[in-house]
Amino acid sequence: VFEVIRAPTVARLYFWALQVSFVEAGREIGAGHTGLQWHPSAPAGAVNWGGYYSGGAPSGGDGTLPGTGSSLPAVDGGPHTRHFAWSPGRKYQFRVWSPAAGAWRSEVTDLDLGETTVIRDLLVEAHGLASPLVWSEVFAACDDPPTEVRWSQLQAREATGLAHTATSVTLTYQSLADGGCSNTETYAEGQCFVQVTGLGAARAAVPDVLSLAGDEGRAGS
């Protein structure tokens, strides 16, 4: 479940995503990412479901995973990003699953309204999913106004139906050399993992693992 607590205020792209890898014959053949976007070309909001093959497309091309169309209008003409109105303070649940062999669907449910929207299907010959993670990709300046988002109820389900809910995560940050900012942070609060940007100071030391259990609280405290 994903929620924007403090929305961006600048005309820059923010992408908050759930990413999964596609597995076939014991190896990961590609990955897809789905989530909400704050997008300069989509004033009411956008949603994305797209991805890439590992090591390039099997038959050449740019490595982009093929997919179906969508009932949602395209943003800037591309297949991945679609217009989707969303609001800060509302909870959205993303689900990636296979409705048919060779098809992997992402859908988003507005939990306040109880409405589910199918984004589109990616067409990948894979028998399962692996390596789930969530991330924030922010193209704003480090000193732009703060933002805050929350992730909760991170869950993976086996083919048998057995569900596994994450109670801890491994943290990574983009390095300063690669264009990252020192004033972003991820911490645990209640039953949520919180991601913030635009802090007034550099983040404290970063733990390798962040857990919801106990009283760990803010990362590095």
Which residues does each PLM region occupy?
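Short, well-ordered strand-loop elements centered on a beta-strand within folded domains, enriched
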Residues: 13-15, 45-49, 103-109, 132, ...
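Extracellular glycan-recognition regions
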Residues: 83, 109-130, 209-220
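Activation corresponds to long, low-complexity, non-globular regions
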Residues: 2-12, 132-221
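Short, aromatic/His-centered strand-loop micro-motif at the edge of beta-sheets
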Residues: 65-93
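Carbohydrate-binding surfaces in secreted/extracellular proteins
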Residues: 86-118
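Secretory/extracellular carbohydrate-interaction modules
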Residues: 1-68, 81, 180-181, 196, ...
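Generic structural signal for short, solvent-exposed loop/turn connectors between secondary structure elements
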Residues: 42-45, 98-104, 125-130
